[in-house]
Amino acid sequence: MAVGSAAALICDTGALLDYLVESAPDHRLFRSAIDQARTRYVPGLVLAELDYFLRAERRAMERFMRDLARGAFTYAPPTLDQLSRAIAIDRRYSDLGLGLVDGSLVALAESLGLRRVATRDVRHLAAVRLRDGSPLELVVHPTDPDKS
């Protein structure tokens, strides 16, 4: 699993939660990894999930939305083709319970020709293969990776 570098990066929900919430156990590590990326993509479904999880951290979400609006992150809403692909990916990995959000993240990676994903979700995303058979390059620093 990689440490951050200047290459483009797709951000998953858990990574952004740790990036935004200063009291998170891995805040500094995810902040460093994400800040090093040249381009930081936020998938549309990740943004919705992030908003839900940050209900109690509204200031953090507001700061993030300002950063997103000024272009510090690249918002990447799913296309209909990407949603169809996300559903197919979720179906293919049904034994993992991957879900639409993670499926859309993989579909975005395929569409952009990227492999680097900042995530805490090692269990799900380490098992996934892109359409060409290659694995994602997970940029992780979790003290306690998601068990979901």
Feature-to-residue mapping (PLM):
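Acidic, PIN/NYN-like endoribonuclease modules and their adjacent C-terminal/linker elements
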Residues: M1-G4, V106, G113-S148
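Active-site neighborhoods of divalent-metal-dependent phosphate/nucleic-acid chemistry enzymes
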Residues: V3-G4, Y75-R120
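Helix-adjacent hinge/juxtasegments
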Residues: R55-A56, E62-L80
